[in-house]
C-alpha cells in the first residue's frame, strides 16, 4: 500500500488510533479557545501533525516522502478539519509540494535534506519588489497573509525582480527559512482565527 495507509493491518490500525487520539486532543483544545485566543495553531500540535505524516504525505519518495494519493491526503485533512477547522486549514496549506513543485531539483533536495516533514507557509500576495544584486535577489517587503506562519519551517513570498524602479521578468516566489522572517501578528478575524494567517 502507498501513502498514509500502512503496510500491515496492525500498523494501519495503530496509525488510525494515533490520528483519532490527536483529533480528540485537537477538539478538546479547540473547545477551550486556545487556538483562537492566540490566533495560531499551537506549535506542539504542528509537531504532532509532522509526527503522523501530514507534511510528508505528498512529498516525493526520493526526498523521503510518502507520495500518498490526493484522495488519501484529502481524507486526512477532512478528519483534522472535523476536529478543528483552523488545524485542518493549516495542515492543508502547510504541505510544501504544491507550492514548491516548480523549484529546481537541487533546491528541493536542499529543502528536504534533513527531513520530508517541512512545514510551508506562503505570503504570496501582494508580490513585493526584490532587488537584483550580483549575489542573487535581496528580498524585503510586507505580505498580508501567510496561513500557518507561526509553525512554518520555510516561508514562500511573492516577489517581482527589480533593478531600480524597473521590473525584470515575471513575478515569482522566494523561499526563505522561517527564522529569517519577522512575523507581525496582525491576524484579527472572526473566522479561521486560529490559522495565524
Predicted regions and their residues:
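DPxDG-like acidic metal-binding loop motif
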Residues: 142-181, 185-187
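Alpha-helical interface subdomain recognition
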Residues: 1-59, 65-75
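Internal glycine-rich alpha/beta core junctions
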Residues: 194-197
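Glycine-rich flavin
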Residues: 43-51, 56-152, 163-167
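Short secondary-structure boundary micro-motifs
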Residues: 11-12, 23, 31, 94, ...
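Residue-identity detector for glutamine
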Residues: 12, 24, 38, 110-113, ...
Amino acid at each position: 500500500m502507498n501513502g498514509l495507509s500502512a503496510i500491515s493491518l496492525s500498523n494501519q490500525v495503530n496509525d488510525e488510533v494515533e490520528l483519532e487520539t490527536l483529533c480528540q486532543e485537537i477538539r478538546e483544545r479547540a473547545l477551550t479557545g486556545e487556538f483562537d485566543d492566540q490566533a495560531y495553531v499551537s506549535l506542539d500540535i504542528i509537531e504532532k501533525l509532522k509526527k503522523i505524516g501530514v507534511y510528508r504525505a505528498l512529498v516525493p519518495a526520493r526526498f523521503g516522502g510518502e507520495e500518498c494519493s490526493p484522495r488519501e491526503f484529502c481524507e486526512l485533512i477532512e478528519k483534522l478539519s472535523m476536529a478543528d477547522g483552523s488545524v485542518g486549514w493549516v495542515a492543508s496549506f502547510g504541505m510544501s509540494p504544491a507550492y514548491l513543485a516548480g523549484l529546481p531539483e537541487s533546491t528541493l533536495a536542499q529543502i528536504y535534506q534533513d527531513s520530508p516533514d517541512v512545514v510551508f507557509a506562503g505570503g504570496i500576495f501582494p508580490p513585493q519588489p526584490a532587488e537584483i544584486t550580483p549575489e542573487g535577489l535581496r528580498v524585503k517587503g510586507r505580505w498580508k497573509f501567510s496561513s500557518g506562519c507561526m509553525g512554518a519551517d520555510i516561508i514562500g513570498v511573492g516577489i517581482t525582480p527589480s533593478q531600480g524602479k524597473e521590473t525584470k521578468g515575471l513575478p515569482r516566489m522566494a523561499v526563505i527559512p522561517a527564522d529569517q522572517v519577522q512575523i507581525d501578528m496582525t491576524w484579527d478575524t472572526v473566522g479561521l482565527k486560529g490559522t495565524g494567517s
